[in-house]
């Protein structure tokens, strides 16, 4: 009884918690400037009705907002294409309601899987997916391709262009922020507190590697590959030169931090070994994003995080859309939005449940606000102003308190609809409440039914993948190929998986604390092993060693001895001891 009260109290405190978010107001303003610019321009040219219809296109212009210019440009090009495909799906299938749930479910699976597999970053694929559901609603209300597609395309292009202009004012801002974070993390690891425990050092080491890896990811993705003078555009050359100088400075800072990280790792892994000159290996340091083929291939494995999130979201969308076709009220689009807002996030079950409850409360209050606004009978341009204010407010509040943000999300989403008259607004408000309940009941059901087996699957799959990633690195050591491009890619993939392993365990442990409580021992053993192998790579360079083949074979035997990935429990103490036994076979650095 006491445990139940404690859990209920903890749940209630999460509902009313107001999180500090320094800089959220400014970041929200930077984010919404492109959207508001597109909304105003399209409304001025084609009228407020078309401006509001194209809002999801403008929202798509926020994609890749934390990426450097080159990366963001690629993301925006891809989002623009899939946004048009998404709306085509919604419009085309609005006349075939039987096919709509399956189509929305499949499309949700594809988009969420690819987005998470490739780590495309915030704000996620929600706007692209909602575009399909909303387009089906617009088409059912009598709108045509000519009403919807041009407005969406124009809004997207204007918002994307404005967002690129905004980011080019300070093009290295994302990279500078990442490098600064990496340097701070490395400094904490290299100069720990005097009373730091081995567990503290392990945590600092993982955080430092995570930050350095992420910074190389952003930096290498953002570097322009060639001198654009060949294009004959002087302004582009000046921009490229300014960015290149800043980029080189950031690269030098990050390289220095990375060498400090590796030197510290070497000293901690092999304290009795003679120190190596890490600067001799600087050309092998840069890492970054693993190849997209690798990311997609590993994400297709049973129990991978992108696959689990995509399956959960697709199931929720399918069930909600089918339910809305069966019940005698409402339309699928709002229920689909309610599901996606909850289940497409990579949160714990408890956090997603809290988010669902906050969504119901926020939607209910937001509908009252929407009805109050409609009583005033706002003009089309007043609606544009309300949308702009609601958009900024919800973006500023989402990091702080999702329930309050949901009030403005609801107002924002409903003001966009082409509705006039108090009676029609009341009808829509009642329908939205019903659809929200259907969507969030579905979301909670999917979270606790489909996601119940997820923690064990995720953890077992990730640690198997992490151990397997050591094998190519060991084969490179055996053949003296560590300093080749292929060797660097294998090492990069190994570090990526080591980081993912700790992240997956941290994210899933709150959902299954009893089952996963001892997996931290496995995490410690695997990360110690992996980082010691990495230290050997730095020390040995291109010298071949025969012992690496034996270590790789031992890992293969370990993986073969484990049962296939499933929700079947595995004794973590046994896995830990097996990993440590292989780890102890690594020779001391002096014996290399």
Task: Describe every region a protein language model picked out.
Residues 295-389:
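Core alpha-helical transmembrane segments of integral membrane proteins
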Residues 65-73, 89, 96, 226-232, ...:
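Hydrophobic alpha-helical segments that drive targeting, anchoring, or assembly
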């Amino acid at each position: 009884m006491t445990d139940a009260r404690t859990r209920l109290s903890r749940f209630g405190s999460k509902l009313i918690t107001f999180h500090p978010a320094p800089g959220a107001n400014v970041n929200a303003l930077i984010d919404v400037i492109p959207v508001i610019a597109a909304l105003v321009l399209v409304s001025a040219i084609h009228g407020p009705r078309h401006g509001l219809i194209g809002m999801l296109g403008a929202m798509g212009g926020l994609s890749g907002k934390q990426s450097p210019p080159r990366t963001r440009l690629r993301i925006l090009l891809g989002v623009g294409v899939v946004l048009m495909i998404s709306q085509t799906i919604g419009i085309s299938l609005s006349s075939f309601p039987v096919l709509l749930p399956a189509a929305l479910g499949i499309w949700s699976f594809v988009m969420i899987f690819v987005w998470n597999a490739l780590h495309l970053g915030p704000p996620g694929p929600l706007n692209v997916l909602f575009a399909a559901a909303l387009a089906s609603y617009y088409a059912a209300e009598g709108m045509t391709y000519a009403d919807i597609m041009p407005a969406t395309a124009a809004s997207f292009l204007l918002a994307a262009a404005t967002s690129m202009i905004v980011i080019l004012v300070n093009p290295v801002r994302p990279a500078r922020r990442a490098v600064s974070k990496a340097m701070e993390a490395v400094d904490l690891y290299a100069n720990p507190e005097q009373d730091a425990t081995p567990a503290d050092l392990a945590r600092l080491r993982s955080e430092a590697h995570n930050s350095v890896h992420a910074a190389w990811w952003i930096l290498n993705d953002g570097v322009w590959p060639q001198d654009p003078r060949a294009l004959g555009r002087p302004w582009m050359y000046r921009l490229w030169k300014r960015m290149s100088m800043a980029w080189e400075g950031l690269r030098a800072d990050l390289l220095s931090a990375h060498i400090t990280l590796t030197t510290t790792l070497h000293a901690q892994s092999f304290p009795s070994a003679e120190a190596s000159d890490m600067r001799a290996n600087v050309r092998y340091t840069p890492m970054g994003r693993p190849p997209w083929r690798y990311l997609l291939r590993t994400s297709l494995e049973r129990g991978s995080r992108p696959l689990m999130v995509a399956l959960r979201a697709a199931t929720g969308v399918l069930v909600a859309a089918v339910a809305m076709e069966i019940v005698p009220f409402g339309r699928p689009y709002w229920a689909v939005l309610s599901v996606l807002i909850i289940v497409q996030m990579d949160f714990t079950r408890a956090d997603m449940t809290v988010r669902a409850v906050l969504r119901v409360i926020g939607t209910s209050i937001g509908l009252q606000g929407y009805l109050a606004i409609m009583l005033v009978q706002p003009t089309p341009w007043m609606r544009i102003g309300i949308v702009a204010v609601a958009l900024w407010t919800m973006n500023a509040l989402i990091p702080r308190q999702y329930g309050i943000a949901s009030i403005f999300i609801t107002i924002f989403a409903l003001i966009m609809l082409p509705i006039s008259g108090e009676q029609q607004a009341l009808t829509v408000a009642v329908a939205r409440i019903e659809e929200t309940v259907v969507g969030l009941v579905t979301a909670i059901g999917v979270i606790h039914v489909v996601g119940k087996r997820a923690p064990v699957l995720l953890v077992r799959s990730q640690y198997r993948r992490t151990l397997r990633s050591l094998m190519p690195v060991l084969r490179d050591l055996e053949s003296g190929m560590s300093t080749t491009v292929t060797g660097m890619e294998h090492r990069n993939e190994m570090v990526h998986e080591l980081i993912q392993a700790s992240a997956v365990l941290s994210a899933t442990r709150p959902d299954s604390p009893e089952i996963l409580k001892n997996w931290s021992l496995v995490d410690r053993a695997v990360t110690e092993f992996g980082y010691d192998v990495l230290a050997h790579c730095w020390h040995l360079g291109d010298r071949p060693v025969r012992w690496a083949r034996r270590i790789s074979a031992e890992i293969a035997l370990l993986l073969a001895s484990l049962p296939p990935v499933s929700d079947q429990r595995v004794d973590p103490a046994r896995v830990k001891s097996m990993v440590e036994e292989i780890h102890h076979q690594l020779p001391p650095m002096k014996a290399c």
